[in-house]
Swiss-Prot record:
Keyword Oxidoreductase attributed: no
MF term (GO), any: ATP binding
Domain of life: Bacteria
Annotated protein name in UniProt: Aspartyl/glutamyl-tRNA(Asn/Gln) amidotransferase subunit C
Length: 95
């Protein structure tokens, strides 16, 4: 699939990026190559290929879900300039 220069201009405008006129030819060729690759990938017959959720057939080992850090919440509350009912109080910033 070949891309036209006008399409690259439109895409760059919609993406809010600036593309120099000197880069348009090179960018058009690169994007066209990527689109050609996608077309070739779509042409591959995958009818007898089972979908995969992961490239490896191994099961991940899971670690035991154990608390490894102590709770410092109360200590941090004491360090705060203002705290109430476990919440940090901050000055109002919006009227």
């Amino acid at each position: 699939m070949s891309l036209e220069k006008t399409e690259v201009d439109t895409i760059s405008r919609l993406a809010a990026i600036s593309v120099d006129a000197s880069e348009v030819d090179q960018l058009t060729a690169k994007i066209s190559n990527v689109l050609d690759l996608f077309q070739r990938m779509e042409a591959v017959d995958t009818t007898n290929v089972e979908p995969m959720s992961h490239p490896l057939d191994q099961v991940q080992r899971l670690r035991e879900d154990v608390v490894t850090e102590t709770d410092h919440h109360e200590e941090y509350q004491k360090l705060a300039p203002a705290a109430e009912k476990g919440m940090y109080l901050v000055p109002q910033v919006i009227d």
